[in-house]
């Protein structure tokens, strides 16, 4: 357990926008799961199935919503969105210790770079020429920063992140290990012999403020226009964003999803795991695409969209597939019957 700072319940309530139920002077130094929490720690309950622990936990306080507050026999912080409060508590009680500024002696830095003295450049990092890195930004071991790239302040690029040339990253963004930003888009054209000819990809990747990109995600550079990731976008591990895509502010994309080239996704959208979006389409603001959804055309109205089939036993699924194959013949038979009735 990592012990952070100590706060009273009243101080925590003020910080996260909650109401104190019980002793506001109770001291808290850590956040823990409700089944394992000990005195001096605060836990949280967001799911009704865990409410049995309210009378069993050793925690000094619980973070919960108004509906569960009356069932809590110990000190509590009460708010309408305990999950949001939990995130804020972790930031307060488990502050990350960042390394001091400086460039590791094994790092390679090209000519004409502007690296703020407070930035931390880890071991074996390669920074090509004309790169700009802002204050308090951390570049992890083995990362590669391409020529002419610009990274804002308070960013964290974990070990072995790769930025191709001319990439732009705003402030307070996080990129996890193995992510590749700015690789060539999948631009090809067949010649008269039927052979594939590569189309040079000369655009950039532009990433806004407060963006998080998961491990081994890939975002390709644009062909001519830039690939743009808006402010506050959160991209999970193993997501693929193709060339010329534009992702609107505060959209989230879950793991293994893919967005094909030149597609625009609006603001405040949610794209489920393993979803696939066709190229050259537009998704309006406030759209939710459920897991494994296959989106082949533009969506113009906010709402929830699904296209996958629910789980069945193998036996049931095989029957469903056979019936699906029979739909065309059934439709023809239905038309013939309609003609007879008329």
From Swiss-Prot:
Pfam families: Hexapep, Hexapep_2, LpxD. InterPro entries: Hexapep, LpxD, Trimer_LpxA-like_sf, UDP_GlcNAc_AcTrfase_non-rep. Pathway: Bacterial outer membrane biogenesis; LPS lipid A biosynthesis. GO terms for biological process: lipid A biosynthetic process. Its EC number is 2.3.1.191. The active site is at residue 243. The keyword Acyltransferase applies. It is an enzyme of class 2 (transferase). Keywords: Acyltransferase, Lipid A biosynthesis, Lipid biosynthesis, Lipid metabolism, Repeat, Transferase. It comes from the Bacteria. Coiled coil: none annotated. Transmembrane segments: none annotated. The keyword Transport does not apply. One of its GO terms (molecular function) is N-acyltransferase activity. It catalyses: a UDP-3-O-[(3R)-3-hydroxyacyl]-alpha-D-glucosamine + a (3R)-hydroxyacyl-[ACP] = a UDP-2-N,3-O-bis[(3R)-3-hydroxyacyl]-alpha-D-glucosamine + holo-[ACP] + H(+). GO terms for cellular component: membrane. Homotrimer. Catalyzes the N-acylation of UDP-3-O-acylglucosamine using 3-hydroxyacyl-ACP as the acyl donor. Is involved in the biosynthesis of lipid A, a phosphorylated glycolipid that anchors the lipopolysaccharide to the outer membrane of the cell. Belongs to the transferase hexapeptide repeat family. LpxD subfamily. This is UDP-3-O-acylglucosamine N-acyltransferase. The lineage of its organism: Bacteria, Pseudomonadati, Pseudomonadota, Gammaproteobacteria, Legionellales. The gene is lpxD.
């Amino acid at each position: 357990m990592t012990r952070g700072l100590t706060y009273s319940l009243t101080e925590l309530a003020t910080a996260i926008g909650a109401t104190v139920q019980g002793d506001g002077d109770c001291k808290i130094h850590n956040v823990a799961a409700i089944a394992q929490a000990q005195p001096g720690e605060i836990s949280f309950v967001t799911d009704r199935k865990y409410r049995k622990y309210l009378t069993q936990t050793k925690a000094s306080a619980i973070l919960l919503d108004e509906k569960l507050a009356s069932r809590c026999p110990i000190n509590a912080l009460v708010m309408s969105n305990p999950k949001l409060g939990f995130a804020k508590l972790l930031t307060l009680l488990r502050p990350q210790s960042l390394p001091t500024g400086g460039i590791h002696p094994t790092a390679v830095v090209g000519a004409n770079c502007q690296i703020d003295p407070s930035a931390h450049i880890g071991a074996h990092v390669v920074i090509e020429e004309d790169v700009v890195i802002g204050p308090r930004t951390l570049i992890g071991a083995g990362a590669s920063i391409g020529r002419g790239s610009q990274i804002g302040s308070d960013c964290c690029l974990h070990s072995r992140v790769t930025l191709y040339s001319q990439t732009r990253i705003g402030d307070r963004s996080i990129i996890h290990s193995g992510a590749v930003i700015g690789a060539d888009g999948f631009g090809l054209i067949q010649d008269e012999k039927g052979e594939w000819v590569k189309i040079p990809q000369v655009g950039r990747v532009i990433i806004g403020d407060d963006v998080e990109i998961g491990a081994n995600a890939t975002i390709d550079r644009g062909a001519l226009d830039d690939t743009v990731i808006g402010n506050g976008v959160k991209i999970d591990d193993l997501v693929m964003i193709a060339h010329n895509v534009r992702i609107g502010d505060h959209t989230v994309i879950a793991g293994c999803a893919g967005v094909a080239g030149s597609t625009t996704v609006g603001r405040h959208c949610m794209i489920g795991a393993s979803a696939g979006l066709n190229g050259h389409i537009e998704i309006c603001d406030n759209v939710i695409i459920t897991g494994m959804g296959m989106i082949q055309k533009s969506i113009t109205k906010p709402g929830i969209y699904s296209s996958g089939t629910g789980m069945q036993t193998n036996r049931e699924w095989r029957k469903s597939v056979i019936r699906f194959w029979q739909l065309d013949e059934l439709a023809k038979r239905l038309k013939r019957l309609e003609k007879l009735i008329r």
